[in-house]
């Protein structure tokens, strides 16, 4: 069975989950769940494989995998967010929020990779990320400024609206990551 194969060969679990996600998306969650039960160590690989094969399923599958193996998934969230954002920028903000819900401490890293892969979604992703982890405002701002400077002003505005107390951290994070962008950012925030 697929579960037995997943137990024996963790790489197979990712391939099976990806194949099902592509061929029969409605069955992907059940299959991924049984594969991860058979081999919890493969949880992150399963989630990453599904993200590549069927980006629109990545958030739900990753949440399921986080319930099975939270430690492995905590380390995989930025990679999954990057994969989905690259495949479909329209999903970038949603996947950023979903991944930060799994590992709030990765909010800065997620901002960095999503901004790099889908700069047009960077500001919206930043807003989703600060909802998941308001304390990471500076790190989120830095990630956007470093990878998508053209989105920095919009992102800063969204971040300050979400967490006004973090305004200094937001501008500071952006200034550290991209000094050239910070004048525009400060100006936008004062408007």
Language-model segments: residues:
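General marker for long, soluble alpha-helical cores
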Residues: 1-191
């Amino acid at each position: 069975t697929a579960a037995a194969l997943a137990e024996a060969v963790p790489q197979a679990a990712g391939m099976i989950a990806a194949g099902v996600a592509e061929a029969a998306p409605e069955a992907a969650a059940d299959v991924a769940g049984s594969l991860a039960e058979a081999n919890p160590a493969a949880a992150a690989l399963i989630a990453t494989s599904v993200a590549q094969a069927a980006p629109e399923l990545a958030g739900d599958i990753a949440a399921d995998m986080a319930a099975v193996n939270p430690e492995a998934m905590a380390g995989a969230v930025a990679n999954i967010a990057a994969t989905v954002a690259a495949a479909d920028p329209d999903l970038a903000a949603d996947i950023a929020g979903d991944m930060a819900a799994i590992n709030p401490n990765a909010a800065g890293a997620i901002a960095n990779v999503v901004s790099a892969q889908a700069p047009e979604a960077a500001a919206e992703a930043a807003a989703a990320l600060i909802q998941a982890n308001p304390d990471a405002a500076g790190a989120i701002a830095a990630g956007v400024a470093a990878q998508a400077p053209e989105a920095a002003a919009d992102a800063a505005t969204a971040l300050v609206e979400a967490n006004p107390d973090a305004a200094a951290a937001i501008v500071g994070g952006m200034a550290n990551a991209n000094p050239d962008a910070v004048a525009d950012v400060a100006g936008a925030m004062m408007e």
